[in-house]
């Protein structure tokens, strides 16, 4: 028997060789060409592919491996590979998340239709097959509305239409192929992340977004901060997510990332989106720091059938802040930070580079800061300190 891994990132981010060191099976790593060399000092059977996500030879290789060395587990942690892995598991009859489950967590229309039918609150929505569908929805629900691709991630391709001017601008260049429209809720956004092992939730935590995932469209700050243990609102979020997940086609072992709206006027919770994967953009570092838990490591070990190296240790809660670029040439920004409550500082900016501001995705940034504190209130106070510090210590030139 064998284990096959579909992977994009480097060994420093996902050390499969270390995670699966107790496995008795051969481990095949099918990897993006750009990062495959980082695994050279491991005993993984490696093969790199250009254009990994669209390269059908990856799928062909999985089938060939299975023919010669039957696959026990097909591991695909990246959101972009979930559907591919679902198809392959279905075709080859491999244990794990099959296509039906994968589709319900990737296709936003299927997801929300499933939840709505079972009484879970979701914003009003409609699949768009043509422009008239969009007109009808706006006539019924009014502005503002969200236009979003059915299977995008990281808020990619989402547009907010506030009025007819926005609608006309959108109509100029959008064919609405594989899109849906949704009523925009003026609500705070939270996320709940966790791990399901052997059909049981073994870990779950709640966090508050700093602003919303669409904040980049206004070039304002974005990030995430955990709730402290015992926070009643966090407990409410977690229970809502657990009951909502129970309505979905789950698989035996999976991580999950669920975004939740809280409408303060009605004090009601709504499901924004669900993903059968670990939260990305480095935000999983908060869980590693505050709980001594690497979700992807434990999920990989569970899928491979080896001992789970899980030892949850609760420390101070933590947060992550993306520092937005302004428009202009970046001339100076902090080399290091003077705060002992910051535990990771990623310098992404390139001095002398011209930036157009932040408009492409939520994680656009020239720096990322990870920081800790005892309460969420303290974390939000530190967000303000960090934002002010970067404004005062960064130089932009037009």
Please state what every model-predicted region is:
Residues 1-100, 132, 306-308, 325, ...:
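ATP-binding N-terminal substructure of ATP-dependent carboxylate-amine bond-forming enzymes
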Residues 106-186, 197-199, 224-246, 387:
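Active-site nucleotide/adenylate-binding loops and adjacent lid/helix of ATP-dependent enzymes
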Residues 117, 300-398:
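Peripheral (often C-terminal) accessory segments that flank ATP-dependent C-N-forming ligase machineries
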Residues 149-151, 217-219, 359-364:
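Short, flexible turn/loop "capping" segments at secondary-structure junctions
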Residues 183-189, 194-250, 262-264, 275-303, ...:
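ATP-dependent carboxylate/phosphate-activation module, predominantly the ATP-grasp catalytic core
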Residues 202, 256, 268-273:
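Protein kinase-like catalytic core scaffold
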Residues 250-257:
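Active-site-adjacent "lid" and substrate-binding segments of diverse enzymatic cores
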């Amino acid at each position: 028997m064998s284990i096959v891994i579909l992977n994009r990132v480097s060994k420093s981010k996902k050390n499969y060789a270390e995670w699966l060191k107790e496995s008795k099976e051969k481990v095949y790593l099918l990897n993006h060409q750009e990062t495959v060399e980082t695994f050279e000092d491991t005993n993984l059977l490696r093969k790199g592919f250009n254009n990994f996500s669209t390269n059908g030879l990856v799928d062909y290789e999985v089938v060939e491996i299975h023919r010669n060395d039957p696959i026990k587990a097909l591991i695909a942690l990246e959101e972009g590979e979930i559907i591919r892995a679902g198809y392959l598991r279905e075709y080859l009859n491999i244990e794990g998340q099959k296509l039906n489950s994968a589709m319900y967590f990737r296709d936003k229309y299927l997801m929300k239709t499933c939840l709505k039918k079972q009484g879970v609150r979701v914003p009003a929505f409609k699949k768009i097959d043509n422009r008239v569908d969009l007109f009808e929805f706006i006539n019924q629900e009014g502005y503002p509305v969200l236009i979003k691709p059915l299977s995008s991630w990281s808020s990619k391709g989402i547009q907010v239409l506030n009025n007819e001017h926005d609608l006309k601008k959108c109509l100029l260049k959008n064919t609405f192929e594989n899109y849906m429209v949704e009523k925009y809720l003026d609500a705070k956004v939270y996320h709940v992340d966790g791990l399901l092992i052997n059909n049981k939730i073994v870990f779950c935590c709640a966090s508050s977004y700093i602003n919303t995932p669409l904040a980049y469209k206004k070039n304002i700050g974005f990030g995430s901060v955990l709730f402290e243990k015992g926070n009643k609102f966090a407990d409410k979020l977690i229970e809502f997510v657990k009951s909502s997940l129970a309505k979905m086609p789950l698989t035996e072992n999976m991580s999950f990332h669920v975004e939740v709206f809280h409408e303060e006027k009605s004090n009601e919770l709504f499901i924004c989106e669900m993903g059968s994967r670990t939260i990305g953009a480095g935000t999983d570092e908060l869980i590693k720091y505050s709980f001594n838990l690497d979700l992807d490591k434990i999920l990989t070990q569970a899928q491979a059938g080896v001992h789970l190296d899980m030892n949850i240790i609760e420390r101070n809660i933590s947060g992550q802040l993306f520092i937005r670029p302004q428009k202009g040439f970046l001339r100076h920004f902090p080399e290091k930070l003077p705060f002992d409550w910051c535990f990771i500082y990623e310098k992404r900016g390139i001095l002398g580079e011209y930036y157009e501001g932040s408009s492409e995705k939520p994680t656009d940034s020239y720096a990322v800061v990870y920081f800790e504190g005892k309460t969420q209130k303290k974390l939000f106070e530190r967000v303000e300190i960090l934002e002010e510090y970067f404004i005062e210590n960064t130089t932009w030139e037009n």
